[in-house]
Every structure is written in structure tokens, then in C-alpha cells.
Design a protein with these regions (language model features):
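Charged helix-capping and loop-helix junction motifs
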Residues: 51-61, 98-101
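N-terminal cationic-hydrophobic initiation segments that often serve targeting/anchoring roles
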Residues: 29, 65-67, 109
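Active-site segments of SGNH/GDSL-like serine hydrolases
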Residues: 40-44, 66-98
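Conserved SGNH/GDSL esterase-like catalytic core that processes O-acyl groups on lipids
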Residues: 1-57
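A generic local structural motif
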Residues: 23-26, 61-62, 102-103
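Catalytic His-Asp segment of secreted/periplasmic serine-dependent ester chemistry enzymes
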Residues: 81-157
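Structural recognition of the beta-strand scaffold that forms the well-ordered cores
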Residues: 35-40, 73-78, 115-118, 140
Length: 157
């Protein structure tokens, strides 16, 4: 399946709502109030040449979530690192871009008054990259590493 993208996350109707109809993430968030909202976006945008455009979309999303979830604690999660071998493949999915976009997410979180969760330490090796055994494609986590990521979130929120 195709993941979500920061520029269309508020308009793509790819969520099944409680009434069975398709809706947006924003529609789903409007169905009830939550104590916490977690945002995990950015991997699909690693090739974007304009970081300010990414930050603008991210800010718009946070502002909208703050409007419809005024009492929720909102967390922006860092983009997880990729494996060293994946990072060296010569395209936009590399750990240099991950670091650049994570800095942007951190800045937006600070500017909008939400929490930034640096999840890298949950899954990265000593060198800061995703261990080769953590992923079959260098990007997406195997279940053991999903558990590490989830436990980090539970322990830190």
C-alpha cells in the first residue's frame, strides 16, 4: 500500500470512518476527542527539494489538529533512520536527508508548541543508522524493531 504524504494528508480520503464511509485523517480525528495524537510523516517526502514547503504543510497539519483536538497532547515523531546500505543507494532516501527533515520537524514542533519525539534511539545502532537486520528493504521495520519503536513511544509519552 501507499503511505500518506504531508501535502495530501488532509485531503486524501483513505481512512474508513466510524460510519463506514471514506474520509480524511482530519475527518477521523473529528469523530471524537483524543488524549494524545501522534504524527509520523516525512519518509515519503525525503526527496523534496524545498524544506520550507515541507515545514509549511507540517505546520498547517498541526494547526488543524490543534483546532479539532484542543485538549490533546500532540507528538511529532522523528523520521526513522534507514540502513547504511540503503542510505548509500544514491537516491533521496538517505540518512543525511532524514537528519535534515528531522531538524525541520523539530523546529515546527517547537514553533507550534507540540512535542517532538526523537525515536531514532529506539531503533538505531551505535552509528546512528538502522541495523541491517532491522529491515528487509532498508526502510521499513521488521516486527522486532516495530516493538522497540512502540516501546520507546510508550515509555516517552
Amino acid at each position: 500500500s501507499v503511505g500518506m504524504h504531508i501535502d495530501t494528508v488532509m485531503t486524501d480520503q483513505n481512512i474508513t470512518l466510524s460510519n463506514g464511509n471514506a474520509g480524511t485523517v482530519i475527518d477521523a480525528l473529528g469523530e471524537r476527542q483524543y488524549g494524545r495524537v501522534y504524527i509520523n510523516l516525512g519518509t515519503n517526502e525525503l526527496g523534496w527539494p524545498y524544506i520550507d514547503t515541507f515545514k509549511d504543510y507540517y505546520t498547517q497539519l498541526i494547526t488543524k489538529i490543534q483546532e479539532i483536538q484542543p485538549d490533546a497532547v500532540i507528538y511529532a515523531e522523528s523520521i526513522l533512520p534507514v540502513t547504511a546500505s540503503r542510505s548509500l543507494q544514491g537516491d533521496a532516501i538517505n540518512n543525511t536527508n532524514v537528519a535534515t527533515f528531522n531538524q525541520a520537524i523539530s523546529e515546527v514542533a517547537q514553533q507550534t508548541g507540540i512535542n517532538y519525539l526523537d525515536c531514532t534511539s529506539a531503533v538505531a545502532g551505535a552509528d546512528g543508522t538502522l541495523p541491517e537486520e532491522a529491515s528487509s528493504d532498508g526502510i521499513h521495520l521488521m516486527s522486532e524493531y516495530c516493538d522497540k519503536w512502540l516501546n520507546y513511544i510508550i515509555d516517552n509519552t
